[in-house]
């Protein structure tokens, strides 16, 4: 077999040199970027612009179960109607005047779709699961059975669907949680 021609050897050698040079340049640039970014911010970068907004939005998303004690809190519901707040109103634990007052507050801001009326506790917890909000705020003492037992009202699996369940009967805690 005859030896390869000199021009073919030169083309192969040139192609190999150019490929190696490109690989070295790309690797050098990558290392340079890693080193300079590590010096500037020590590797801790803030999230990109849109994800910051999403985190703030997720932190404020609340599901409020409107029991009698929460309905009695001195809160201006009009201020929270535009936020990421959904009110779950168990019809058996709510009086008509409060339903009307809350409904009017949300209607003024055209957010009446954020009020969900639930006929049963199973339906209420199903809504909590499907909404998947960041916080669920309630006073479970308002939902104890008529026999007076302190059986837990919050289902065990609810932590898979809601990040934080705030269950308190202290008025200041409820107001602070609702308003922040």
UniProtKB/Swiss-Prot annotation:
GO terms for cellular component: cytoplasm; peroxisomal membrane. It is found in: Peroxisome membrane. Keywords: Membrane, Peroxisome, Peroxisome biogenesis, Transmembrane, Transmembrane helix. The chain crosses the membrane at residues 15-32. It holds the Pfam family Peroxin-22. It is a single-pass membrane protein. One of its GO terms (biological process) is positive regulation of protein autoubiquitination. GO terms for molecular function: ubiquitin-protein transferase activator activity. InterPro entries: Peroxin-22, Peroxin-22_C_sf. Its main location: membrane. Involved in peroxisome biogenesis. Present with 259 molecules/cell in log phase SD medium. Belongs to the peroxin-22 family. This is Peroxisome assembly protein 22. It comes from Saccharomyces cerevisiae (strain ATCC 204508 / S288c). The lineage of its organism: Eukaryota, Fungi, Dikarya, Ascomycota, Saccharomycotina.
């Amino acid at each position: 077999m005859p030896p390869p021609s000199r021009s073919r050897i030169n083309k192969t050698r040139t192609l190999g040199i150019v490929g190696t040079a490109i690989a070295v340049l790309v690797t050098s640039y990558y290392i340079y970027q890693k080193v300079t970014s590590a010096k500037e911010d020590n590797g801790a970068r803030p999230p990109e612009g849109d994800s910051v907004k999403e985190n703030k939005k997720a932190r404020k998303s609340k599901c409020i179960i409107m029991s009698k004690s929460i309905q009695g809190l001195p809160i201006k519901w009009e201020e929270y109607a535009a936020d990421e707040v959904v009110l779950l109103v168990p019809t058996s634990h709510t009086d008509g005047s409060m339903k009307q007052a809350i409904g009017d507050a949300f209607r003024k801001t055209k957010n009446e779709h954020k009020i969900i009326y639930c006929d049963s506790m199973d339906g209420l917890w199903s809504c909590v699961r499907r909404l998947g909000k960041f916080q669920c705020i309630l006073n479970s003492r308002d939902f104890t059975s008529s026999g007076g037992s302190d059986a837990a009202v919050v289902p065990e699996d609810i932590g898979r669907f809601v990040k934080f369940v705030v269950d308190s009967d202290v008025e200041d805690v409820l107001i602070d949680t609702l308003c922040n």
